[in-house]
Structures are given as structure tokens and as C-alpha cells.
């Protein structure tokens, strides 16, 4: 693959997840220089993430909404960005909401309960970027429910090991190879290494 005359592809979990779900437009958009208009739900999620980060920074704890657990040595979103070279044709990038020692924390909004994310590859992708993490916590707030309703707040934990790391690498390389081939075959091969429009 490295000898095909095209550059390496840089991917993130969200790009690969879009590809895996068949949302080709969203997966290809960063390489085509197309900005996808954020949905109302995405805008709401962004605002909540900003508010939760501000609260956690100020008090050194998880947001009260998620139990207020004391954080030991937290790093927040901008300080957690990582890019990792997996081979000569694939780079993986990502940003955690919170990295607290060997614990990764991801905030979610929307109707999906935390337990459903355990079936995703998200925690395995982030383990590739942060090999020292031992557990990945999903903290979810379903703003479609009232605070007192069951399911308003859900939390799920994925425990990470050598097997999850191997599984994650296999998935990333499989999805990235498919996406890279699609981009090359559809006239975007020259965009692979430019980095324009990649998630920050």
C-alpha cells in the first residue's frame, strides 16, 4: 500500500465510525474540504461539553451531574490531543474530554445510554492513542428526559487490556484501508497527506 504513490491517511474514530456505518459523505468530508453543517444536537453537545470542562477545571472534580468524583491529575481536551503513526500509510488522531491518570473520560449527550457505547470501538481507538489507560468511562446525559427520570444520567466503564488494543488496531487499519482506497479511487488521493479539514 505504501508503494501506491499516494500519501498516508490521517483518521479519527469519528471519521472511521461514519465510514463503518455507511455515512460516506461525513467520512469523506474532511478530505474533500467540505464542512458538514452541525446539527442542533451537535451544537447542544458542544455547549454542554464546554460547560462540563469548565466545571471540572474549576473544582478538580467530575461535573456534579456525573457524581462529582474528585479527579487526581486531570488533563482536559486541548491538552490531550494525540496523533499516532500506525504504519507508513495510516495515522490515528484523537482528543479525550478528560484524561485522569490511567482513566479516560468521555462525555456524551443524547438518547443513547452509556452501556450502548461499550459495543463501539471508541475506547479501543483511544487505547491506541493512550496506551497507558486502563479504563474508559462513558458519562452520558439524556437531555430529552427530565432530571428525575430513570436514564437521565447513565455511566458505563470499559476495561482495557492487550486484547482490546489488538482488536482496536485491527479495526482501525481495516476501516482506514477501505476509506483510503475509496478516496484514491474517487479522485481524493492528493488530499490524503495535506491535513486540511482534519479534526483538531
Question: What are these regions, as identified by a protein language model?
Answer:
Residues 1-101:
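Metal-dependent nuclease catalytic cores that hydrolyze phosphodiester bonds in DNA/RNA
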Residues 6, 10-11, 73, 80-88, ...:
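Metal-dependent nuclease catalytic regions and adjoining charged, substrate-binding loops involved
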Residues 28-32, 105, 151-153:
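Short acidic (Asp/Glu) and glycine-rich catalytic loops that position anionic groups and cofactors
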Residues 54, 111, 142-144:
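Short loop/turn segments at secondary-structure transitions that flank enzyme active sites
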Residues 56, 109, 131:
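Hydrophobic/aromatic-lined pockets within catalytic cores
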Residues 94-112, 126:
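Conserved catalytic cores of phosphodiester-cleaving nucleases, focusing on short active-site segments
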Residues 112-119:
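Active-site-adjacent loop/helix micro-motif of nuclease/hydrolase catalytic cores
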Residues 120-131:
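An active-site-proximal "capping" alpha-helix that borders the catalytic cofactor pocket
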Amino acid at each position: 500500500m505504501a508503494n501506491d504513490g499516494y500519501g498516508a491517511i490521517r483518521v479519527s474514530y469519528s471519521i472511521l465510525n461514519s465510514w463503518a456505518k455507511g455515512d460516506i459523505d461525513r467520512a469523506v468530508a474532511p478530505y474533500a474540504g467540505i464542512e458538514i453543517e452541525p446539527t442542533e444536537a451537535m451544537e447542544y453537545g458542544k455547549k454542554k461539553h464546554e460547560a462540563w470542562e469548565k466545571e471540572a477545571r474549576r473544582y478538580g472534580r467530575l461535573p456534579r451531574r456525573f457524581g462529582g468524583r474528585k479527579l487526581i491529575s486531570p488533563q482536559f481536551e486541548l491538552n490531550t490531543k494525540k496523533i499516532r503513526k500506525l504504519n507508513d500509510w495510516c495515522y490515528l488522531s484523537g482528543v479525550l474530554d478528560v484524561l485522569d491518570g490511567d482513566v479516560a473520560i468521555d462525555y456524551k449527550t443524547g438518547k443513547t445510554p452509556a452501556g450502548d457505547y461499550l459495543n463501539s470501538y471508541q475506547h479501543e481507538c483511544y487505547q491506541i492513542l493512550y496506551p497507558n489507560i486502563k479504563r474508559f468511562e462513558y458519562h452520558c446525559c439524556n437531555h430529552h428526559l427530565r432530571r428525575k427520570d430513570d436514564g437521565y444520567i447513565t455511566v458505563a466503564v470499559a476495561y482495557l487490556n492487550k486484547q482490546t488494543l489488538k482488536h482496536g488496531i485491527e479495526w482501525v487499519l481495516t476501516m482506514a484501508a477501505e476509506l483510503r482506497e475509496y478516496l484514491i479511487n474517487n479522485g481524493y488521493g492528493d488530499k490524503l497527506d495535506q491535513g486540511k479539514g482534519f479534526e483538531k
